[in-house]
């Protein structure tokens, strides 16, 4: 008579099989969602916009940190830094570094991205009427500089991210620095910057989709 496996081993075998039975359908559904085009286009940008809306009433705390530690921070480099990823991308293309798209396709996609970003940002600015931290006007939400910077960073990612992750890392580092500087310069709330980043990313995603 063959040996009978101990009860504990049988139970262990049953327990080990259960995840396979129950997780496979769930895994297939999860894979279907994450592979969907709409998910690929929105899984970063939408959460950033939602975060911007969610922290709207908590931005004063971050402004107070600025007032406590760097009250005299006033530098205009963010006026130029926002364009840096796009300038570098065009420079790489001009020097013959192969990108994802042809010149024509890249310029059309980028033009769509700019048009979408500008229209969305300005429409919200003129309807939300959020006062800037420095009280200069009521066009604070969302941050146009941050939207431009993240739109440009996403362009770089689309065109050169597959060649090296450092293109993407560098571009988004510059974009993040732009957003932070807008807060340090007392021109925007944290909520403005988060929403602007999300809008910029979504604009490029849609611009390259069209």
What are these regions (language model features)?
Residues 1-98, 105-110, 210:
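N-terminal targeting leaders of membrane proteins
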Residues 20, 24-27, 65-66, 85, ...:
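A generic structural signal for ordered alpha-helices
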Residues 39, 73-84, 100-105, 109, ...:
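Solvent-exposed, acidic/flexible segments
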Residues 45-49, 107-123, 151-152, 194, ...:
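Hydrophobic, lipid-facing residues on alpha-helical transmembrane segments of integral membrane proteins
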Residues 46-49, 81-91, 116, 120, ...:
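Lipid-exposed faces of alpha-helical membrane segments in multi-pass integral membrane proteins
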Residues 57-64, 119-127, 145-149:
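Hydrophobic, membrane-facing alpha-helical anchors
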Residues 90-99, 120-132:
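Membrane-helix exit/interface motif
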Residues 125, 130, 134-210:
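Membrane-embedded catalytic cores of phosphoryl/pyrophosphoryl-handling enzymes
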